[in-house]
Curated annotation (Swiss-Prot):
Protein's organism: Fusarium proliferatum (strain ET1) (Orchid endophyte fungus)
Coiled-coil zones: none
Places the protein is found: Nucleus
Encoding gene per record: FUP6
Ranges annotated as biased composition (Polar residues): 577-595, 608-623
InterPro entries associated with the record: AtrR-like, Transcription_factor_dom_fun
Protein name: Probable transcription factor FUP6
Length: 700
C-alpha cells in the first residue's frame, strides 16, 4: 500500500486505494465495475480465504463457481428469468392500439389493473412519488372507458381514443412493478418480457423535454432496477441525466413565474426521484455520478423554499379558466402550495401549520432519501474518484461521519425503530407491503459500511483496520437482523440495494471470523441467518443465488477452521501447520535484542508468557518455536495478498485460533505439557552454529 503524506493537510496513515474491475469479453466487449460496488473488498476477502484453505481455494478458483463480479451484477438476469415470448401471439382481450409496440405488452383486465394500480401507490409511490396520482388515474380510466368490451372482433380490442407511447410505458411499468408484490397474477401478455423491449423505445423520449416523457423514462428505469437489470437501468439513468438538463429540472422551478404551483411540485418530485436513482446506480455499479451537486439548485421538498417567482406569485392555471394537466390535486394541497408561494413573495402568509405538516409528511420518505443520497454522493467522491486525483484526508472523513450521524439523529423516532410485533397485521397487509423504518435503518447501515469498508483492505495490524472492522461488524449484524425481521413479518424486500448490503454484511462477518476478530459461534449463527435471507431473495433475483453460493463456501471454511482448532494439539499432524501465525499486537518489549553481542535475554514468563516480538518495523515475531517441536506455517500477511491472484499460487492453511485479542498467539499449546519448562533461549540457541549462513533464515 502506498502512503500519502502532506505537510499542510492531515492524511490517513495508510492510503486507502480501492480499485475497480474491468473484464474483457468476446467481440471487443468490456465491462467495468467500480470500487464503490465492493468488488475490491470482495476480492480481498476471497484471497484471504484462498490463502488459508486449500480445499476452498480449488472451489473458488473453479470456473463454474460464481466470480465476485457475478455476485454484484448478473449479466442478462432479466432475460434468463423470462422466456422470449412475442406478446402479439398471446391471448388477450385488449391492446393499446396501433403504433404501440407489442413488446411493451397489453393492458390487463380492468379488475386486475385496478388492483395493481392501488398496490403500486401503496408501495413504490411512497418512496418515489414521481407521478401525479390523479393524472395517471385519469389516464387509466380514459384507456379502459374507451375499450369496447362488447366488440366481437377477433383481434384484441383497441381503445377508441388513441393513447401515447409515454403513457403506455408508464402504465405498463406500474402494472409490472406492482405485480412483483401483489397476489394478482399479471397475465403473460401484459408483462414486459425483456429490458430490450423497453430500451429501444426510450431514446426518442429523452429528447422531447416534456414531463410525461421523462416520467416514462424514470418508470422504465425503476422497473429495470426492480428486476436487477442494473446495466440496462444505468443506460436509462444516462438518458435521464441528459433529459433533466434539457428540460431544466436541475433548476428550482419556483424561480420561474410561468410555472404553476402544481407544476413546481411535480417537477421537484420528479427531479429528486431521479437524483436518488442516479446515486443508487452509481454506488451499485461503481460508476461516476451522473448529476453533480454543484449543478443543482432545486430546493428540498420539505423546505425551506429559497427562491421567488421573478415577477408575480404563480396562480394555478385552473383559476384562470385554462385546463391544467395537474389540476387534479386536492384543494387543500393546492391552497397550501399557493399560500407558501405567496408568502415567499411577501404577499401573504401560510394559513395553517397543519397544511404545511401534511405536505411535509406526504414527501418525508423521499426527502430523507434525498439527504442520504447527498451523503452517499459525498462518500463516492471521497473514496472512489479516479486514483490520480483521489485525496482522502482525515478531516473530510470526520466531516462526512459527523453529517451521517447528524442525519440519523434527526430522523423521526418512527424511522429509527423497527418492531414488527407492534404493527397491526391486518392493517399492514391492507395498506403496506414495505416498511419505512426498516428501509431507513438499512440505508444508514449501508452508508456506514461504505465509508469504513475501504479500511478493511489495509493491513490488519493497523489501527485503522482494527477500528473499521469492529464498526463494520456492528453494522453487519444490524443489517442481517433487520432483513430477517422483515421476512418473518411478511414485508417485501423490494429495493435491490437490500441484496447487496445483506450479502456484504455476510462477507464482513465471514472475514472477521477468518481473522479471529469475531466469535466464530456467533458469526456462524448470523451468517446462517444471512444465508436464509439470500435464499429468500433468490426467489426474485438470480443474483442472490450467486451470493448464496459464495457465502455458503465461506461459512463451510469457517466451520472447518473451527473443527481443526478444537482438536487436541497432539492430534494435529505436521502437515496441518507450517508456521505460527504472527501476532500483530504483541508486546515488543518481551525480548530485547542486543545487536553488539547478539545476546538474548531470558523470556519473562510472568509478564508475558506467550508473546515476544522485536519492534523493528516488520511486526514479525522473533521467538518462533523450533520446528522439531511443532511444525506450523506462517500465514502471509493480508497486505501481501493484495497482489493479483494467481491460480497457481500455493494455498496456505491458517488454523490458529485467537481468543479475544487478535495479537495473541493461539492457545493450541494449552492442552499439552510445557515442553520448554526450565529451558532458556540461550540453551536452545547455544547448539546452533551462528556461523552457518542458513542459521538466521532457518529460525527467523
Amino acid at each position: 500500500m502506498s502512503r500519502t503524506t502532506s505537510s499542510n493537510t492531515p492524511t490517513l496513515p495508510q492510503a486507502v486505494q480501492e480499485r475497480g474491475s474491468l473484464r474483457t469479453l468476446e467481440k471487443g466487449e468490456s465491462q467495468f465495475i467500480g470500487s464503490s460496488s465492493g468488488i475490491y473488498f470482495v476480492n480481498t476477502v476471497r484471497r484471504a480465504f484462498i490463502n488459508a484453505n486449500s480445499r476452498l481455494s480449488s472451489r473458488l478458483l473453479d470456473t463454474a463457481h460464481p466470480t465476485p463480479e457475478e455476485c454484484i451484477v448478473a449479466d442478462g438476469e432479466d432475460e434468463q428469468q423470462r422466456p422470449d415470448v412475442d406478446a402479439s401471439l398471446l391471448p388477450s382481450s385488449f391492446s393499446y392500439g396501433h403504433g404501440i409496440p407489442t413488446g411493451l405488452g397489453r393492458p390487463p383486465q380492468p379488475d386486475v389493473a385496478k388492483q395493481l394500480f392501488m398496490t403500486y401507490f401503496q408501495t413504490w409511490h411512497r418512496f418515489f412519488p414521481f407521478l401525479h396520482g390523479p393524472t395517471i388515474l385519469r389516464d387509466m380510466e380514459d384507456l379502459y372507458s374507451s375499450l369496447d368490451e362488447n366488440s366481437r372482433a377477433s383481434e384484441p380490442i383497441p381503445p377508441r381514443v388513441p393513447t401515447t407511447l409515454p403513457k403506455v410505458v408508464i402504465l405498463q411499468c406500474i402494472f409490472n412493478l406492482a405485480s412483483l408484490h401483489n397476489s394478482s397474477q399479471l397475465p403473460v401478455a401484459s408483462e414486459i418480457q425483456k429490458p430490450t423491449d423497453l430500451l429501444s423505445y426510450l431514446p426518442g423520449l429523452a429528447v422531447k423535454g416534456d414531463l410525461v416523457s421523462i416520467q416514462a423514462l424514470f418508470a422504465a428505469g425503476l422497473l429495470l432496477v426492480a428486476r436487477m437489470s442494473l446495466r440496462a437501468a444505468s443506460v436509462v439513468s444516462g438518458l435521464l441525466s441528459r433529459a433533466v438538463f434539457l428540460a431544466g429540472l436541475h433548476r428550482c422551478p419556483c424561480r420561474y413565474g410561468k410555472l404553476t404551483a402544481d407544476e413546481c411540485d411535480i417537477r421537484k418530485r420528479l427531479f429528486w426521484c431521479i437524483y436518488v436513482f442516479d446515486r443508487y446506480l452509481s454506488q451499485a455499479l461503481g460508476h461516476p455520478l451522473g448529476i453533480q451537486d454543484s449543478d443543482v439548485d432545486v430546493c428540498p421538498l420539505d423546505g425551506p423554499e429559497l427562491h421567488h417567482p421573478l415577477l408575480y406569485p404563480t396562480v394555478p392555471s385552473s383559476y384562470s379558466g385554462v385546463a391544467s394537466p395537474f389540476s387534479g390535486l386536492s384543494a387543500m394541497s393546492v391552497d397550501a402550495t399557493i399560500t407558501g408561494r405567496q408568502s415567499e413573495a411577501g404577499l401573504g402568509r401560510a394559513t395553517s401549520e397543519d397544511e404545511s405538516s401534511q405536505k411535509h409528511n406526504r414527501h418525508s420518505s423521499l426527502s430523507f432519501q434525498v439527504q442520504y443520497s447527498r451523503l452517499l454522493g459525498r462518500a463516492l467522491e471521497l473514496f472512489h474518484k479516479s486514483l490520480h486525483i483521489r485525496s482522502i484526508d482525515s478531516g473530510s472523513i470526520l466531516s462526512l461521519q459527523t453529517d451521517i450521524n447528524a442525519l440519523w439523529n434527526a430522523l423521526p423516532s418512527s424511522l429509527q425503530e423497527f418492531d414488527p410485533s407492534s404493527c397491526d397485521t391486518t392493517d399492514r397487509n391492507q395498506s403496506q407491503v414495505f416498511n419505512e423504518s426498516a428501509h431507513f435503518i438499512l440505508l444508514h447501515s449501508q452508508l456506514v459500511l461504505l465509508i469504513h469498508r475501504p479500511r478493511l483492505s489495509l493491513e490488519p495490524s493497523t489501527p485503522e483496520f482494527q477500528s473499521a472492522i469492529q464498526i463494520c461488524i456492528n453494522e453487519a449484524r444490524e443489517i442481517i437482523k433487520i432483513t430477517s425481521k422483515q421476512i418473518n413479518a411478511g414485508y417485501a424486500l423490494f429495493w435491490p440495494a437490500y441484496l447487496s448490503v445483506t450479502w456484504m454484511a455476510g462477507i464482513v462477518l465471514a472475514f472477521a471470523c477468518q481473522l479471529r476478530l469475531y466469535s466464530a459461534e456467533k458469526g456462524k449463527r448470523e451468517i446462517g441467518m444471512c444465508l436464509d435471507v439470500l435464499l429468500h431473495m433468490s426467489e426474485r433475483w438470480k443474483l442472490a443465488k450467486n451470493c448464496h453460493a459464495v457465502l455458503s463456501d465461506l461459512a463451510e471454511a469457517i466451520q472447518e477452521m473451527e473443527h481443526t482448532a478444537k482438536r487436541p494439539a497432539f492430534e494435529v499432524s505436521d502437515s496441518t501447520f507450517d508456521s505460527v501465525h504472527s501476532g500483530r499486537d504483541s508486546v515488543s518489549s518481551a525480548m530485547n535484542y542486543q545487536s553488539d553481542s547478539r545476546k538474548r535475554a531470558r523470556l519473562d514468563t510472568e509478564s508475558n508468557p506467550r508473546s515476544s516480538q522485536r519492534n523493528d518495523g516488520s511486526g514479525q515475531p522473533l521467538n518462533q518455536i523450533p520446528a522439531d517441536i511443532v511444525n506450523v506455517s506462517m500465514g502471509e500477511p493480508l497486505g501481501s495478498s493484495f497482489e493479483p491472484l494467481d491460480a497457481t499460487d500455493a494455498a496456505i492453511e491458517d488454523d490458529i485460533q485467537y481468543f479475544g485479542d487478535p495479537g495473541r498467539l493461539s492457545s493450541w499449546e494449552s492442552g499439552m505439557p510445557d515442553l520448554l519448562a526450565g529451558i532458556t533461549w540461550e540453551s536452545l540457541l547455544g547448539g546452533i552454529n551462528e556461523d552457518d549462513p542458513s542459521w538466521d533464515s532457518a529460525f527467523f
